[in-house]
Amino acid sequence: MKTTDKIIADYKSRFMAELKTKNPGETEFHQAVSEVVDSVVPYMVQYPYLMEQKVLERMVEPERVIMFRVPWVDDRGEIQINRGYRVQMNSAIGPYKGGIRFHASVNLSIMKFLAFEQTFKNALTTLPMGGAKGGSDFSPRGKSDAEVMRFCQSFMTELQRHIGADTDVPAGDIGVGGREIGYMFGQYKRLRDEFTGTLTGKGQYWGGSLMRPEATGYGACYFAEAMLATRGESFAGKRVCISGAGNVAQYAAQKAMRLGAKVLTLSDSDGFIYDEEGLDEEKMKFVFELKNIRRGRIKEYVTKYPHAKYFAGERPWRIPCDIAMPCATQNEIEKTDAENLVKNGCFCVTEGANMPSTPEAIAIFQGAKILYSPGKASNAGGVATSGLEMTQNSMRLKWTAEEVDQRLRTIMADIHEACIKYGTEEDGYINYVKGANIAGFMKVANAMVEQGLV
């Protein structure tokens, strides 16, 4: 008779071996699935029907994967070809929902990992949304507005046949902001001759929701607030290191400042800035203008504010801080970075990006018993507010910023409570990874079982 531990170990080993055989070379996807498997399999064995129905095996297999060519013409008149993707992972609890990423690193593995993570994140929001992700290996960086528009129109010309307000509702992600959403929505409307909430992140005057740009960064701070409260702490007076300088990082920095923290760093792919005095409203106004209007590099910050320092080719995790908020990209915090953070006094890591910490880094955070939340929980504010935008579109109305912000706060508080429910361990330590994975998994799993083998 096998012991429970033996059953769990054998199942994990067999499951991951089969996954890697079926999905060779997809390291990001393997990593995302492995984290979920570690959390949910010990829970699954308590409910034999989940094993019998092979729910996890079905969950890691996308319902549909769409890959297509995206031809466009650059400003020199030369033809360029990029590759587009849409991974429609799971629709058990609602229409597919997930962002579109334009970045040179985009490949099928990254799209599948993001779509898999999105499924759990969307389930955590309590809103009826399935999981998906899309994108292209096209990078808007260095491209003219006209080139970006031509690419977006070509991309949407193919994608439009696979999406819809009740089928699949894309949004923005890295490389896809309001400009790109606008170009894609315009092309969708032209081709389909309909004005529906098929994309979220739209402009405020044509169906967008107030607070959508702020939502991911603000939501991460609201989640961090709830985490800190479990230890009788708050943002007030805390030193915060933030990576990234895009939408998520900008608004995480703004909200952390307004909650009384001293934000020390921002970064982009070239390096990071360290402002020992801390960012303030005036400095953030400059960052917004630099990144969103001029689309410049973060190193220009030190030209404007010479007291700050710029570190080329580095990440900000060696700067002493109390709270770290990785808001850039996947696997940006590695083992050495995690060791530096813990050694320098960091006691709270709240992820604003998707899977920004490697498994080795997460093990260090949890081993040190510091507060650590995975992106699927703490950065769910963005997709939650996208869901609220879908609701407003379907009702043909518009809520005030205060109404949206209050709903966002409630959703982040509910996600935190779900993490506590499923993630509190015997010694009282809250394992937010375990809590988020089990809470999201059970909602999707039960929906799949109840809907039959489809």
Functional labels for PLM-detected ranges:
Residues T167-A171, E194-L199, I242, T265-D268, ...:
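General beta-strand structural signal in soluble alpha/beta enzymes
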Residues M111-L114, M184, A220-L228, A252, ...:
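Buried hydrophobic packing segments
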Residues G271-Y372, A377:
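Rossmann-like adenosine-cofactor binding region
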Residues T200-G203, G208-P320:
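Glycine-rich phosphate/diphosphate-binding loop of Rossmann-like nucleotide-binding domains
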Residues M1-L210, K443-G452:
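N-terminal ligand-binding/catalytic initiation module
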Residues K2-A32, M227, V342-V454:
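Adenosine-phosphate binding glycine-rich loop
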Residues G77, D173-I174, S209-T216, C241-A245, ...:
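Active-site nucleophile and cofactor-binding loops and adjacent substrate-binding regions
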Residues E147, R179-G186, L210, Y251-K255, ...:
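Short acidic, glycine/serine/threonine-rich loops at helix termini
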